């Protein structure tokens, strides 16, 4: 009987539980459970928690704990990312651990970037030696620059689809909101201009490629496919621009596409999709990325492969 490996990712938009087995170094028998908690909105500027999200998070963890206890994995890792990095409430962290019955490891942005990279290279067929990995979370965005198949640089930005949505798109999202978000993001991601200059010699010799790992990237693929595109899990900046116009419903030209989206994309994702798309567009423009492909794994898969290979991170 094969060992079971589990990871619980306490993200800013949702809590993800994934339990798997391995066969021939590959993940099999994949079980997934998700709880939308919008945890990224829980933290005040002071690092304190809003009571509404405290209660919601504990209730979600209680449900997850019951699932784990029904069929516990042999190895389990619980990780917290940006939102938990920003919390200065140790009592709440202890409450979370007591509810789960497991310790929580709050990982650094560099650790997160390394695990995302591990998740991508262990699950995704990669042809280029030089590329970017883009991971748009709920409250942070990680960008990993890969040169000659090795990590060159990991950058983390304190903005994600959930927090940007709270800043610009709480009303349905107009073209004015969209433009203002792009201007704001151009400043947030200004550090990427230096990264692009570092890679300018590579840019001359090849089209620059990126792998996207987040819910935003998956939703873009599903959306374009629902419109009749044959994406084959890749898309360009022009495709992103088109999808942004659909989400805004520019000049009411996209009623048909909007209906398709409602039937294709989960409402929790759809509600923050324009903000995630704005982040993706801004990064793509600054880094002059030609093609974005969907990766088959990311942070959770990186944790699972580390557990499988080392029985620890």
Go through each PLM region and give its residues.
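Gly/Thr-rich phosphate-binding beta-strand-loop-beta motif of the actin/hexokinase/Hsp70
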Residues: 1-29, 120, 126-157, 215-219
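N-terminal glycine/serine-rich phosphate-binding loop of ATP-dependent small-molecule kinases
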Residues: 1-6, 10-16, 20-83, 90-102
């Amino acid at each position: 009987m094969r060992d079971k490996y589990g990871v619980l990712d306490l993200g800013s938009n949702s809590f993800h539980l994934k339990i798997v087995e391995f066969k021939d170094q590959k993940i099999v028998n994949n079980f997934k459970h998700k709880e939308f908690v919008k945890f990224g909105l829980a933290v005040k500027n002071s690092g304190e928690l809003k009571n509404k999200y405290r209660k919601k998070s504990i209730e979600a963890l209680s449900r997850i704990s019951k699932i784990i206890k029904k069929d516990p994995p042999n190895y389990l890792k619980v990780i917290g990312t940006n939102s938990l990095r920003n919390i200065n409430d140790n009592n709440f962290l202890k409450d979370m651990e007591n509810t789960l019955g497991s310790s929580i490891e709050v990982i650094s942005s560099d650790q997160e970037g390394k695990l995302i990279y591990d998740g991508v290279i262990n699950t995704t067929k990669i042809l280029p030696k030089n590329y970017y990995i883009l991971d748009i979370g709920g409250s942070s965005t990680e960008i990993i620059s890969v040169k000659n198949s090795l990590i060159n640089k990991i950058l983390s930005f304190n903005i994600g689809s959930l927090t940007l949505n709270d800043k610009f798109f709480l009303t349905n999202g107009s073209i004015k909101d969209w433009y203002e978000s792009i201007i704001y993001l151009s400043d947030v991601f200004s550090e990427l201009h230096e990264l692009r200059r570092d890679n300018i010699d590579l840019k001359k010799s090849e089209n620059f490629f990126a792998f996207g790992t987040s819910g935003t990237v998956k939703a873009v693929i599903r959306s374009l496919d629902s419109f009749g595109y044959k994406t084959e899990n890749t898309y360009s900046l022009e495709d992103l621009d088109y999808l942004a116009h659909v989400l805004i419903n520019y000049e009411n030209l996209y009623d048909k596409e909007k209906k398709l989206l409602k039937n294709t994309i989960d409402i929790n994702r759809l509600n923050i999709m324009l903000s995630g798309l704005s982040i993706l567009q801004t990064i793509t423009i600054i880094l002059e990325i030609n093609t974005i492909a969907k990766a088959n794994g990311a942070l959770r898969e990186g944790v699972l492969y580390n557990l499988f290979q080392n029985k620890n991170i």
